[in-house]
Amino acid sequence: MAIGGGGGGGSWSIHGRPDVTSRYEVLGRAGSGAYADVYRGRRRSDGAPVALKEVHDAVSARREADALLAAAPSRHVVALLDHFPGGDHDDDVLVLEWLPLDLSAVVRAAAAARPSALPAAQRKRWMLQVLEGVAACHSAGVVHRDLKPANLLISEDGVLKVADLGQARILQETGTYQGMHPYEQSSGVEPWVSQQRAVLHGVKENHPSHDSETQTGQEPERLTAADYLHEMDQLRAKSTHGDVDKMSLQDGNASCLATCSTADIDDDPFRASYSYDAEEGMLEEESGAFTSCVGTRWFRAPELLYGSTNYGQEVDLWSLGCILAELFNLEPIFPGTSDIDQIGRIISVLGNITEETFPGCSNLPDYNKIFFNKVEKPIGLEACLPDRSASEVSIIKRLLCYDPTKRASAADLLNDPYFAEEPLPVPIEGLQVPESKDEDDDSTEEWANFRGGDSDSDFDEFGSMDVTKTDKGFSIRFS
């Protein structure tokens, strides 16, 4: 079971909660993460199996509970059965229906069974269930923000349900995110452009519309890659001693590259997801701006990779496209080893991100900080989906497009002609469901072959690098 949540801490043990144990028997640990622990349990009143999710961050727990209640009742969204709020010394405990499998188990089982793989009729039923779950969330105004196969749980009889909504947000009925598309507002400054101080690697950034070169008339200072990495080392050293303003780095208007790049350089690039902690969640609550550092890299929309903090359900639709493509290929379509590599992989397939392909992209916080050589001949989605029919490629194209306003909704895709073609989707009871995974199963090693070599740095992924230092920070061009 996928683990969500943020930072914080309480007892870190469900066994010391008589309010919980008096109503639920704790049978054993089912999964564990930095910010949540999940236990198998049984309801004492009727013996029904349950999942007891102990969340070590009250903000994340409340957010998940609110999102689940907003989307209920839905056959394809996990049911929240009970909620035990935490206190000064206890964590929140969410009681959820027990679902022993997830969609990544289906993908792994099908990949192991090659060449028979996943029959088309079964694949269509899995796809329809994913679409129904996402459509239910979106109709309730919920943005999941971390859709991936591991967060799509499956019952033993094959019913798939959207789960792990610890990063979810509920869009307001009025205001920025509801009833007015964030990319279509007509104010002088695009809504995702930060009006407050942002930070790129600890360097203050001016408003994007004020070009430092134009203001000063001076050529920017040129840096070698070694100079750039030396500056990064100095910033890390300052950060260690608390000299970098942590609140600035965690501000809701700071971009994902601004807050995450040094970690990509420093740490294991296979660490696919950015840790969404409690402090970041509280800052979102206070500022009203979303953070761009949500979701898991392989499924993160381009606007998030470029630092957007004002977005809607369209980010889920990009993730949905990646998930459905994985059901076709039985492997991730964009398995980036770092955020920069992720953008590079997407561009190599879909082409250059420009105002023509993504209106308003030049206003994204990091658009003018990371540059790639122009791709003259992108390989296209057809090449990434070999031996697939036109209708199969079409459904992925409707989701994996740069312009968020052109991504098809999950509700629309439920009526896509592809699902009316032969072979028709099998009924749910006709699905071949893998055996339940062991408690200690760790799927990370299953995907180890998708690592980008042995590199542990964004910069090792590219041949040459042109680094420019300006008053805004660093501008990097990769070739």
From Swiss-Prot:
Modified residues (Phosphothreonine): T291
Induction of expression: By auxin. Down-regulated by cytokinin.
Keywords assigned by UniProt, alphabetized: ATP-binding, Kinase, Nucleotide-binding, Phosphoprotein, Serine/threonine-protein kinase, Transferase
Active site (catalytic residues): D146 (proton acceptor)
EC number annotated for this UniProt entry: 2.7.11.22, 2.7.11.23
Protein name: Cyclin-dependent kinase F-1
Amino-acid positions noted as binding ATP in the UniProt annotation, renumbered to this chain: A30, G31, S32, G33, A34, Y35, A36, D37, V38, K53
Major enzyme class: transferase
Keyword Iron: no
Region (Disordered): 429-479
Protein kinase domain span: 24-419
Matching SUPFAM superfamilies: Protein kinase-like (PK-like)
Family the UniProt entry places it in: Belongs to the protein kinase superfamily. CMGC Ser/Thr protein kinase family. CDC2/CDKX subfamily.
InterPro entries: CDK (IPR050108), Kinase-like_dom_sf (IPR011009), Prot_kinase_dom (IPR000719), Ser/Thr_kinase_AS (IPR008271)
Transmembrane recorded as keyword: no
Catalytic activity: L-seryl-[protein] + ATP = O-phospho-L-seryl-[protein] + ADP + H(+); L-threonyl-[protein] + ATP = O-phospho-L-threonyl-[protein] + ADP + H(+); [DNA-directed RNA polymerase] + ATP = phospho-[DNA-directed RNA polymerase] + ADP + H(+)
Single GO cellular component term: nucleus
Extent of Basic and acidic residues compositional bias: 468-479
Native source organism of the sequence: Oryza sativa subsp. japonica (Rice)
GO-annotated molecular function: ATP binding; cyclin-dependent protein kinase activating kinase activity; cyclin-dependent protein serine/threonine kinase activity; protein serine kinase activity; protein serine/threonine kinase activity; RNA polymerase II CTD heptapeptide repeat kinase activity
